[in-house]
Amino acid sequence: MKKLLSLPPNLVGCFHDITHLPADEWFCTNDPVGTKLGSGGGTTWLLRAAYEAEHGNQTFDEWLASDKRLLLHAGGQSRRLPSYAPSGKVLTPLPVFRWERGQSLDQSLLSLQVPLYNRIMNMAPHGLNTMIVSGDVFIRTTSPLPPIPEWADIVCYGLWLGPETAKNHGVFVSTREQPTQLKCMLQKPSVETLASLTTDHFYLTDIGVWILSDRAVKVLMQHSTTEGHITEGPVTAYDMYGQFGCALGSNPTIADAEVADLKVAILPLTGGEFYHFGTSHELLSSMLAIQNLVNDQREIMHHDRKPHPSIFVQNADIKIRWTQSNRNEWIENACIGEHWTLTRDNIVTGVPDNDWTLTLAPGQCVDIVPIGSNQWAVRPYGFNDAFRGPLADVEFLGNSFASWADEHGIGIATIEGGHDLQAARIFPIVDNINDMGIVLRWMLSEPNLDEGRHLWTIARRMSADEISNEANLSRLVSQRTHYRAHNLPMIARNWQHSVFYQCDLHNLAGQYRDNDIDLPSPMPSSAPLLTRACDAMFRSEATANESASYEAQAFGLLREGLTADALRVSQRPRLSVYADQIVWGRSPVRIDIAGGWTDTPPYCLMEGGNVVNIAINLNGQPPLQTHVKPCLQPHIVLRSSDLGASETITTYNELAEYNRVGSPFSIPKAALALAGFLPQFCTDSYPTLESQLRAFGCGLEVTLLSAIPAGSGLGTSSLLASTVLGALNDFCGLGWDNTDIGHRTLVLEQLLTTGGGWQDQFGGLLPGVKLLQTDRGFAQTPEVRYLPDTLFTQSDYKACHLLYYTGITRTAKTILAEIVRRMFLNEHNQLAMLRDMKQHALDMFDAIQRMDFNRMGRLVGRTWQQNQLLDAGTNPPAVQAITSLINDLCLGYKLPGAGGGGYLYMIAKDEEAAARIRRILNEHRPNDKARFVEMSLCQKGFQVSRS
């Protein structure tokens, strides 16, 4: 999705340099200087500027339809939030949320806004290509997003808010009979009007998130273009909300037939929250509300020592101690020297290193803005200053400007731009830190300080508007970066009470490298194991010389945490069959249809996992089988029917070689070890394997059959391991249930260093269609919710489920290692994708529970899209060549597991489409191994029996 930003003029020229965002994805411009276009005219101007910059030979209609776009209006003067007026409110730095993982110390309002908008636009039907939003709000939702109707020309999101809040905003009115269709839009209606509506109407409060079809965009542009074509005529002022919005609906308040003809859907953002960052007060109140959204101590990942929760410090050098009397303090990109005194309602931004003696009374704020190469604008202001109105009538520094001027001996009439405080030239420009402190003292609290009066009098002075227009934003950001780099070692050192290890450690490691910061001191062994593992992976990312050893340490600690409980309980295998009996274990394989990867440690240990999968037989049989039988000699014989290999084990050392590269029997060796046939896993002690087997009563012959090619994506290795463990459990009387077998499979995979999650083994150990869920923590015991199997077994549906072996193989280990690495690092984008996948599994659960075949099929397609976002190699060209042949015939398809090859699972639109898919792929086989395999739902899961 392309992002089109309307920004303050001074920010446009350096936006990409200071944000490091790619210019080909982020386009920015400003409204014409000195012209007020309104939100509608501004939208037209922004679209026209973007079209001129990138259209090539496309017509405007072609360009508009060629991509999805986010239009973000952030070009205001920021009168009521002076601290971030120069860089634009949209780039306001916001602290890491104390309850959130994967955020960055350098995050901004913009970086927090965009992910939700991306999610919404990913759901938008074809033709709804343009989203228009405001730049000074943060919106989040705790519930699934509602589906977007395909019939709408305009989709508007709203919240259910009370009349005391709604009266200050636009509201969408609908009838109770058609609650998603707009009747009319009202701007700032009275409480009485809203009360009268509720008897037979609903109303939603506008949150400024609109999606427009190409048709609606052109209607909006035509109304803000006075003559000629919408890409060429003069742009005029037009309000998208007060004029365009009020002309929408079945009974609009403004008559305009062309606008009223547009079909409008209004959608409640269920579980939505709306936080405004438009004023100094809102900067603190909104952030405090966000930080306090979660008070459950189990959800809060660090425990700070602030004396009050409304104290926010970022990118700063603080040399004072906070006290209980401090409230509503915002310090960012600033140095607070040891001789400063702060009280409450203070915002301090941009202040360079200093040793001033300075007191800020309640409500006094300071903003220092770099000008040119070596000067600064000194801007004190009041917490509630609105910067609007003539100097004779306006408030400044918490009092009237007139009284401030009188106290400081300044004649209002002598001030240039006195018609409006925003235009008044009252802020002095200085070229050294000492003068900066002196003139601040004079302006804030020492009107009799002659030196300060003299400096103010002789200085060049700027207005608030001029400061924004002339600010050197590169210097401003450079100072911020310097302070942040200075903070990092302290934040790391104070890790138990800071956000360090809940941050995006990939981002943090980059900051350590870029600023050549020494790594933190080694973490104590008493620290939580998972934190130590994340610390090791952070060090691997931050350093080049020891990257591999730190990575190995991280995986080793993960392995220790996952295996500790199982290894703490040793086993005492005892022969539980007759001398001529054979134990036969057999298992289906699994197809993950939603939520795969969320079961993978360490993600599932941090946040839990949700997976919907199905257990299937191939060609009518469980494809994974293990036979265990006694043998007279005191040794262990391992055989593989499909590989035609065998190995005889006579010593503990030979059995302990389950990690030997290239061994076809790594899985059964590790399974035998976990069953108690290695000393470290056995309750009793024996000098040799031979002596243990003699005491056991016989040797063992273990025969494996995997009737599936390697790299199938069907969970083969995990389920083969659980099949072997299940058969040994019965043969040796170990007393494990399916949950124990699943856990020990996870341990086995850790012993083999292949890693992996829990959904593979539980997907086949347990029958049918099910949702598997775990909570955070090392005890990953899935809760199982079985689903109706009608969509898989009823004849007309069953024929639509197709399984095709592509003949392309790809092992999952290297894919897994890189994705797991990013899990350790709390990498923001991947974490967001995993959370989306986790919710997606619940959507799939709902679709199957409702027996909605079409929705289920489409959701499988969404699963495939998610997998590709997580790992681009999931869908190589060879696979794309296959799917391109049948794309239009499927509701959805995916490669099970890690992808890249193996089997292709398809859900055809209907039986006729299924027949056509079979014909097409049989006629266009990509290789001599490619073939259809008959799949059927397994209703029994893992089975074990005796001869």
Residue ranges and their predicted role:
Residues 1-129, 133, 138-146, 404:
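N-terminal glycine-rich phosphate-binding loop and ensuing alpha1 helix
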Residues 14, 80-82, 141-142, 165-167, ...:
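Short helix/loop capping segments that flank catalytic or ligand/cofactor-binding pockets
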Residues 46, 553-561, 671, 719-731:
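Stable alpha-helical structural segments in soluble proteins, enriched in small hydrophobic residues
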